[in-house]
C-alpha cells in the first residue's frame, strides 16, 4: 500500500513593493487580497507582504504568487521567467487606464522650457533597469542626440524619491519619474516635491505589471485575475483604493509590454544606448 504523503505545500508569497510611500496602505491591500485568495482555495499564503531588497531574486522566486514588477525588466531579464496577471489603473496625472507616461521633472526656477534645452546638463535616474526612470526617458531623448550623447553627466540616485531630491537640490537638472510615484510623493512627503515642476511627459506604456511565478498554472492565473478584479470593484474597499490611487484593474499578458522593448530598440537604432 502506498504511503500517505505528509509533505506540506510551500507557502506562496506576495508583495506590492514598487510604491513605498504608503506602506500601511500596501499592507492593508495585501491582507485583503490574501484573504480572498485563501477563500478561493489558494494557499498556504504568507500573512504579510514581502518588502524585497533584491527585486530580481524576488520576481524569480518559485514561491511567488503575486507581486508588482517593472515593465523594462519584464521584457529583458524576466523573459519567460514570470507570468503577467495584469495592471492596475491609477487615477493620477499621466495615467489613462492601464497606460501611463513618465513625468519629466526639473527645478521650478530653471528657465528651460523644452527637453532640447537640457543638452549638456546632468540627468538623475533611479536605475538603469527602470522603465519609467530610464528606458522611457532614453527613448524620449534619443531623437535629440549627437554622436550618441545628449547629457553631459548622470547620477544613479537609487530611487525616484532620491532622483527628485537630486533635481530639487541642484545635484542634477532633470529626471524622469513614475507618475504614480510622483503623485505619492506629493501626497505623503510633499516637501520632497516643492520646488520642482513637470517639464514634459514620455510616450505611453503599460503601467507596472502584476506578475506571478512562471510555474503558476492557468487556473490559478485566472483566479488571481478574478480576485483582483472583484476586490477593485468592492465598494467596501473604496477608501483603500482611493488612498492608493487605484481606480481599476485590467488583465494583460506579456505581449502588452512590447512597447517597452520598442522604446529600447528605437533608442539603440539611433545610437543612444545610455543616458
Where are these regions (language model features)?
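Periplasmic-binding protein-like
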Residues: 86, 94, 100-101, 190-226, ...
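Surface-exposed, charge/polar-rich loops and edge strands
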Residues: 153, 159, 206, 227, ...
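N-terminal hydrophobic or amphipathic helices and topogenic motifs
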Residues: 1-81, 90, 97-100, 236-275
Amino acid at each position: 500500500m502506498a504511503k500517505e504523503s505528509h509533505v506540506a505545500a510551500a507557502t506562496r508569497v506576495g508583495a506590492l513593493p514598487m510604491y513605498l510611500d504608503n506602506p500601511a496602505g500596501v499592507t492593508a491591500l495585501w491582507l485583503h487580497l490574501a484573504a480572498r485568495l485563501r477563500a478561493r482555495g489558494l494557499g498556504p499564503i504568507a500573512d504579510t507582504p514581502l518588502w524585497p531588497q533584491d527585486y530580481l531574486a524576488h520576481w524569480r522566486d518559485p514561491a511567488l504568487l503575486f507581486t508588482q514588477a517593472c515593465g523594462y525588466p519584464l521584457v529583458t531579464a524576466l523573459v519567460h521567467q514570470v507570468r503577467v496577471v495584469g495592471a492596475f489603473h491609477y487615477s493620477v496625472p499621466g495615467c489613462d487606464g492601464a497606460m501611463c507616461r513618465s513625468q519629466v521633472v526639473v527645478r521650478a526656477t530653471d528657465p528651460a522650457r523644452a527637453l532640447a534645452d537640457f543638452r549638456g546638463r546632468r540627468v538623475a535616474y533611479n536605475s538603469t533597469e527602470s522603465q519609467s526612470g530610464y528606458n522611457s526617458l532614453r527613448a524620449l531623448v534619443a531623437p535629440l542626440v549627437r554622436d550618441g550623447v545628449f547629457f553631459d553627466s548622470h547620477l544613479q540616485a537609487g530611487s525616484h524619491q532620491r532622483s527628485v531630491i537630486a533635481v530639487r537640490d541642484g545635484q542634477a537638472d532633470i529626471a524622469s519619474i513614475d507618475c504614480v510615484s510622483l503623485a505619492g510623493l506629493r501626497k505623503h512627503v510633499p516637501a520632497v516635491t516643492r520646488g520642482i515642476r513637470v517639464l514634459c511627459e514620455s510616450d505611453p506604456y503599460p503601467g507596472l505589471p502584476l506578475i506571478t511565478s512562471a510555474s503558476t498554472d492557468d487556473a490559478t492565473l485566472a483566479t488571481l485575475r478574478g480576485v483582483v478584479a472583484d476586490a477593485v470593484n468592492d465598494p467596501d474597499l473604496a477608501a483603500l483604493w482611493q488612498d492608493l490611487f487605484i481606480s481599476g484593474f485590467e488583465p494583460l499578458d506579456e505581449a502588452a509590454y512590447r512597447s517597452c522593448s520598442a522604446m529600447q530598440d528605437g533608442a539603440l537604432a539611433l545610437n543612444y544606448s545610455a543616458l
